[in-house]
Amino acid sequence: RNQFGDSVGIYHSKMTPSARYKAWKKFRSGELKVIIGTRSAVMMPAPKLGLIIVDEEHDASYKQQEGFKFSARDIAIKRAQIIKIPIILGSATPSLRTLKLVEEKKFQTVSLTKRVTQKSPPKFSILDINEVKLVSGLAPQAIEAISQTLTQKKQAMIFINRRGFAPQFICSYCDWKAMCNSCDSSLVFHHQAARLICHRCDSAFGVPTHCPSCSKAQLSFLGTGTEQLEETLKELFPKTAIHRMDRDSTTKAGSLETILSEINNSDTGILIGTQMLIKGHDFPNLELVVTVDVDQGITSLNSSAVEEMGQQLIQVAGRAGRSDGNATVLVQSRYVNDQNLLQLKSGNYLNFAKSLMEQRQATTQPP
């Protein structure tokens, strides 16, 4: 709006129906010249659409998984193709599908070869956590690195793409596991809400004291989420400001802006968060990043898991060292000799993507 004034509007699902309709109507009439929106905005009518920009085009959230399933990225490309207008796909970590289109000369590339701040990228260090006793998912070496960062009056970020307290709730006697009655997904324990919540359909259930299957009182939590990390780090660093940024901590209006303001107005502190943390935010004083659950990407059977792991690692690394170029990314893993992880250690995403493309071609996997 600083550039284009009142001709800029927004469109997303958190708006009231009346506000969404007003934005839709103004864009259709041409009163709004620029619309910034989420997935559904790609279908908004416009009298003279001249350009489509898909920011962070690699992001899996462009895919609508429930109800009417679609990819907003793919619809944007098709729409631009039909009405013969330019489309820009922006990303520091382009999807393999996009890189394949570039290889086939169907897309042109414009590369930014330097960071905006002209500072050196952070150094990657892979931390072997085999035979290491973890504290809420953190290795002692990672905790020590956080402590040193705080001593230097800098900020540390803990990246874990799991919200809630623990991703699994099980019975150690009969192996019962809490599952959603509606969609059969694993239920996640949320401590603050004192509920078992399905992250797929948002169904919520009470927390049983005895196993529904065998009636034994041998229920326990498995795994680590953002809530658990927050509680543990508050115990380890009681005098340090700790900020958690995930879907649960940013539901209230203005809460995200408040968290970001607190982070940017303090020299030191700890940031904990999910993928929400890595989407374009600028944290000038961030000097350390610790990734907790990178092994999910290595062991998952999902064909896109390794690609998404690489994208997340490079994106989260991009938040650090923007002011003095002296940052470190600590990658905790039990697979320290994994070739894809070692490829990412250089911090060069395109080399990683090229290697991954070659692996996929060798096994006849898309793209």
Where are the model-predicted features located?
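Inter-lobe coupling/hinge segments of SF2-like helicase ATPases
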Residues: R1-P367
